[in-house]
Regions:
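Short catalytic micro-motifs in class I SAM-dependent methyltransferases
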Residues: 89-90
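Short alpha-helix
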Residues: 162-186
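A short glycine-rich, Lys/Arg-flanked "PGG" loop and its adjoining helix->strand segment in the class I
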Residues: 99-113
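Short conserved loop adjoining the S-adenosyl-L-methionine
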Residues: 74-79
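C-terminal lobe and adjacent flexible extensions of AdoMet/dcAdoMet transferase-like proteins
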Residues: 196-205, 210-241
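Conserved class I S-adenosyl-L-methionine
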Residues: 114-150
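A conserved beta-strand element that flanks and buttresses the S-adenosyl-L-methionine
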Residues: 86
C-alpha cells in the first residue's frame, strides 16, 4: 500500500472533525445516487464503504480493502451496467479527463450518473488553494485536451482547476464533445469548515461539534454565496436516456 494512503488512514482515524466533513460529502453523494450498481473511483482509504457497504471500490493503487485496482481512464466495466460512478477528489488528478468521460459513458446505463465532489476555485477559495494547499491551480490549462495516458505518471499529479473549468468555461465544449452526457447539477458548497479542519493534516482549528453547527449554517448560505465563495463543487453528470 502506498505511503500517502497510510498517512491519510492515520488522519482519518485520529480526526473526528475530518469524518464530520466527509460524512457531509457522502450525504450529498448518496442523495443523488440512482438505484443500481455504484462504483467508486479513487477509493483510497476505503471510507465511503462505511456509508455505502455495497459500493464497488476501485483505485489506481492497491489497498487490501479495495475491490479492484484500475485506472479511471481504462475501466474494466461492462457496457451499460453501472448506475453510478462516484468520486471524491479524483477528477483533478486524472491525466486526460476526456478519456475518463468516454470510459464512464460507455459503462453507464441510460440515466446513470457520475457524481464528483471536487475543489472549487472561486473568489473566496482561490488564495487558499493557490497559497496554502500543496496542489497546483492552473486556470489556463485545457481540461478536455486529448491524449494517451502515461502508465508511469504519478497518480498524485494534479490540477485543482480542472473541475471548475469543466463546470464553467468549458461547459459548452463538454456538451459538444460528449453529447450523450449532460451536466445535470453543479452545486457550489463548503465555506469555512473544510479549510479550518486542516484536511488530512495533523492539525485542526475547529471542533467536531462546532463543525456540525457551522455546516448547517453553510447549507443555508449556499444558494446566495456558493458560486462566489465555495471551496467545493459537486458535479452530477447524467447519461442521456
Amino acid at each position: 500500500m502506498a505511503e500517502p494512503l497510510n498517512e491519510y488512514l492515520t488522519a482519518w482515524d485520529r480526526k473526528p472533525v475530518l469524518r464530520t466533513v466527509y460524512n457531509d460529502f457522502y450525504d450529498r453523494i448518496i442523495s443523488v445516487c440512482a438505484p443500481g450498481l455504484t462504483v467508486e473511483i479513487g477509493g483510497g482509504i476505503g471510507n465511503l464503504k462505511q456509508r455505502l457497504p455495497n459500493v464497488v471500490a476501485t483505485d489506481i493503487q492497491f489497498a487490501p480493502w479495495l475491490d479492484c485496482v484500475a485506472d479511471a481512464q481504462n475501466l474494466p466495466l461492462a457496457d451499460g451496467t453501472v448506475s453510478n460512478v462516484v468520486m471524491v477528489d479524483v477528477l483533478h488528478h486524472i491525466e486526460f479527463p476526456a478519456v475518463f468521460f468516454r470510459q464512464v459513458s460507455r459503462a453507464l446505463r441510460p440515466g446513470g450518473r457520475i457524481i464528483m465532489i471536487e475543489p472549487a476555485i472561486t473568489w473566496g477559495s482561490t488564495l487558499f488553494y493557490r497559497l496554502i494547499h500543496h496542489e497546483p491551480v492552473r486556470m489556463s490549462a485545457d481540461p478536455l485536451v486529448e491524449g494517451t495516458p502515461d502508465p508511469k505518471r504519478d497518480p498524485y499529479d494534479s490540477n485543482q482547476a480542472i473541475p471548475t473549468l469543466i463546470a464553467t468555461r468549458e461547459r459548452a465544449r463538454f456538451a459538444r464533445m460528449f453529447p450523450d452526457l449532460a451536466i445535470a447539477q453543479a452545486d457550489w458548497f463548503s465555506f469555512l469548515v473544510y479549510p479550518l479542519t486542516g484536511g488530512f493534516k495533523p492539525w485542526s482549528l475547529i471542533s467536531p461539534g462546532m463543525a456540525e453547527r457551522v455546516l448547517r449554517l453553510e447549507r443555508m448560505l449556499e444558494p446566495s454565496l456558493g458560486r462566489l465563495a465555495a471551496f467545493r463543487v459537486m458535479l452530477v453528470v447524467e447519461k442521456r436516456a
